Amino acid sequence: MSSSFFLKGKSRQVYKRKGDKIKKNNPKKQSAHNLENGNESSESDLDIRKFSEAEESESDHETAEQKKLRLAKKYLEEIEKEEAKRAELKEIDDVVGDRLKKDYLELKGKLKYEIAEKFEEPRQEDLRFIRAKEHRLTLTCVCISSDNSFVFTGSKCGTIVKWGVKEKRKLGSLTYKTHSHFLKGGIVSIAISTDSKYLVSSDESPNIQLWDPHTLKHIHTFKGHKDFITGLVFRKNTHDLYSASKDRSVKIWSLDEMAYVETLFGHQSPITSIDALTRERAITAGGRDTSVRVWKIAEESQLIFNGPIGSLDEVKLLDEEHFVSGSDNGSLCVWSLLKKKPLCTITEAHGSENEVPRWITSLATLLNSDVFASGSYDNNVKLWRVCEQYRKVLPMFSVNVCGFMNCMQFTNDGRQLYVAVGQEHKAGRWFKLGSAKNGLLIVNFNIKTAFKINVFF
C-alpha cells in the first residue's frame, strides 16, 4: 500500500486572463530632448576636463612664487571692483546729501554764493540787442524759463513774444489782433512756472490770462481783481500764483485746481511790485505808501518795513532773509527780515537830472548770491556787490544801453542778464527818449567757475 506522501499530485495550472500580456523589460527610447541634453552635458564635461587639464598643465609649469603672484593679482582685482562699487555708492550718497543740505540752507536763507569777484566786465561783443516787429511800442516786462531754454517779453502794444535762447530767434507771438478776446491793451506783467508748464500774463484789464508756454494756446482766465494787475509771480517749484494789483490787494491762485484761494489786504496805495521764492510767502512794494510788506501766508500775518520818502516802486528778494528795494527818489536799499530799517542805503544810485534824482525803474537779483543789478533811464544797467554781512554795497561795473530799463532778469547760472528796453517808462508816458530803441538786450557775462560758498548763522 503506497503512502499518499509518495504520490505526485497533479500540477496546478495557472490560467491567465484573456488580455493579460507579459510585459517585456525593453528599455525606453531616449527622447530627442534628452539626447540633446546628453550631448550638451557630455560636451560641457569635455570642455571642463580640457580646461582643468590646461589649468593643471599651467600650474605644473608655474613655480610657487608665480602662483602666489597670480593669486595676489586676482585678489587685488576683486578688491578694486568692490571698492569701486562702494565709492560709486558713496559718491551718490554724498551728492544727494549735499543737495539736501543746500536746499535746506536755501530755504532758511542761510546760503550765499560769493560770486561777485568772479564776474568780468562784458565787452561790446558780449552784448546783443534783438527786436521784433510785433513790439511796436515800449517793452514792459520779461521772464525766463528755469531751464534757460526760452524767454518771453511783453510790450505796451499788447503783444507777447517768445524767444528761443539756443535758436537765437523769435519762436512765436501772441498779438492783440489775433487774441483780442484775451489781450486787452498793453502787457503789464508776465511770469512762468518753475516747471515751464504755465505762462501767465496781465494787461490793462483786471484779469489774468493763463497760457501754454510751449504751444501758446490759451488755457484759462482768472477773474477777481477790481483794477489792472501790476505784478505776477509763481512760488518756486509750485503752481501757486501770487498777483498784485492797483486795487491794493494781493490774491493767491492755485493753478493745480484752477481756482482762487484768498485775498490779502494791507497796502494803502496801489501795489507796484511783487516777488516770491520757495517759502509760502510773498513780498510787495506799496508805491506811495512807502512800505514793503512780507506776507506770511501760512501764519496769516505780515511784516511791514517803512522805506525812504517817495514812491517805493521795486522790490526783489536776494534770498529768503534779505531783499533789495528801489524808489523814485533814486535810492537803493538792502534789507533784512530781522530789522525794520535798511541795512544799507545808496542815494541817487543812477545820478540826477536837473537836480532831480533818476528813479529806479527795475531790479534783478542773482538768487542766493552777492550780486544784483539796477536800471533807470541814465543809459546804464548797473551791477552791484553786497558785502560785509549785507551792510555795504559796492559798484561793480555798468553796461551802456540807451533807453528805459523797464524790467530785467538773470538766468539761473548768472551768465546772462535779459533787459526789456523801451523809449518810455513802463507805467506811463511822462517823457520819451527818442534816441532809444524798443527791444531786448542780452548781456553775456564771463564768470570763473570756482566761487566761494558762505553759510550764515
Where are these regions (language model features)?
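Conserved strand-to-loop turn within each blade of WD40 beta-propeller repeats
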Residues: 154-157, 202-205, 244-247, 285-289, ...
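Structural hallmark of WD40 beta-propellers
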Residues: 149-152, 196-200, 209, 218-220, ...
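Intrinsically disordered terminal extensions that flank WD40 beta-propeller domains
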Residues: 1-138, 428-434, 444, 452-457
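WD40-repeat beta-propellers
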Residues: 160-164, 208-212, 232, 250-254, ...
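WD40/WD-repeat beta-propeller blade-loop signature
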Residues: 138, 147, 183-186, 195, ...
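Loop/turn segments within WD40 beta-propeller blades
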Residues: 143-148, 190-196, 202, 232-239, ...
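WD40/WD-repeat beta-propeller blade N-cap
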Residues: 132-139, 176-187, 223-229, 265-271, ...
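Beta-strand-rich domains and repeat architectures in extracellular enzymes and scaffolds
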Residues: 130-158
